[in-house]
Regions:
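Extracytoplasmic beta-rich repeat domains
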Residues: 24, 39-62, 91-106, 129-146, ...
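C-terminal motif of bacterial Sec signal peptides marking the signal peptidase cleavage site
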Residues: 14-15
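Sec-dependent signal peptide recognition
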Residues: 2-9
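Short loop/turn segments that connect beta-strands within beta-propeller blades
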Residues: 83-86, 123-126, 163-167, 209-211, ...
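WD40 beta-propeller blade core
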Residues: 80, 120, 160, 205, ...
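Structural signature of WD-repeat beta-propellers
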Residues: 74, 114, 154-155, 199-200, ...
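Beta-propeller domains
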Residues: 74-86
Length: 296
């Protein structure tokens, strides 16, 4: 399964023409450059190296910010806290293990996951390691916490919920695992009364944080097509919670809005993405799998 996931991700990232139309030899014409008047001027405030990068590994380590601090990680296990205004290093911690998921932040905790399925939780104030815990498989997305629990989604489509103070497992959910999936997992949304996660099956599920009981579940997209490639409908982007509405998007499927309280579908449209949607000015924005931007 891991080999299939890795092969599929390489093909998708490289823009392989095997899946694109009837004429494999047809060259894709570059889009015409359009002159435009810039309305916003962007000035770089600072730039700081935070490690050696991901090299050739197919991972996406993203920094996260809380207040006046930015937290970042590199594949070699270096975790760095920076002043958001100046870029000055506040602390650095070296874990000496390959980090593949992160950086997550919640309630004073900085969290990362590793290629071997370890989860490390650090104190956001000084970078000291509070605890580490083992989950079922490699972690590719950022762990999330509400201060009481830490939620970790692993590449085998399982989700572990750990005690935020000790790292002990409280409960686990085993998601339906399709034969093929895009290499990646959804980040969870964690509140005081709900854990919201998307899965490779195209399902969006709301859990009770206390015991893992399912509050509701809805399928954002149904697999269609003859081949396993055509039937992939992974939710790999973090669901977006805006008030009482949840927005999410699948790969090769749909973007939609559902009720936070019931999971009832409010609307959906054809779309395809493995990134989280964004919200602004009364619209939902999706970065499409074919390098397009859609607004709904």
């Amino acid at each position: 399964m891991k080999k299939l996931n890795l092969l599929l991700c390489v093909l998708l990232v490289s823009g392989c023409s095997w899946f694109g139309g009837d004429d494999d030899d047809a060259a894709i014409e570059p889009a015409e450059l359009v002159d435009f008047q810039s309305e916003v001027s962007v000035v770089r405030q600072w730039s700081v190296s935070v490690g050696s990068g991901a090299k050739n590994y197919l991972i996406s380590l993203r920094p996260t910010a809380n207040g006046d601090t930015v937290f970042a990680a590199d594949y070699e296990g270096q975790i760095t806290a920076l002043d958001v205004g100046t870029g000055n290093v506040r602390w650095q911690t070296q874990l000496d293990v390959p980090v593949t998921g992160g950086v997550g932040y919640g309630a004073g905790l900085v969290m990362v996951g590793t290629v071997e399925g370890e989860v490390f939780t650090l104190d956001a104030d000084d970078g000291s390691v509070l605890w580490s815990s083992q989950v079922s498989s490699e972690v590719l997305s950022s762990p999330k916490s509400n201060g009481e629990i830490v939620v970790v989604h692993s590449i085998d489509n399982k989700m572990a919920v750990l005690d935020a103070k000790t790292g002990e497992e409280i409960w686990q959910h085993d998601g339906d695992a399709p034969i093929l999936s895009v290499r990646g997992t959804s980040e969870s949304v964690v509140t005081n009364n709900m854990v919201l996660s998307g899965f490779d099956s195209g399902k969006l599920i709301a859990f009770s944080p206390d015991n893992g009981s399912i509050i509701w579940e809805t399928r954002l997209a149904l697999p269609t097509g003859r081949t396993e490639l055509e039937r992939m409908v992974d939710i790999d982007g973090e669901p977006l919670l805006v008030g009482d509405v949840i927005y999410s998007v699948t790969y090769q499927g749909r973007v939609g809005a559902v009720s936070r309280g019931t999971g009832r579908s409010l609307w959906s449209q054809d779309s395809s993405s493995h990134h989280a949607p964004a919200h602004g000015d009364g619209q939902i924005y999706v970065t499409g799998a074919e390098d397009s931007v859609q607004a709904f």
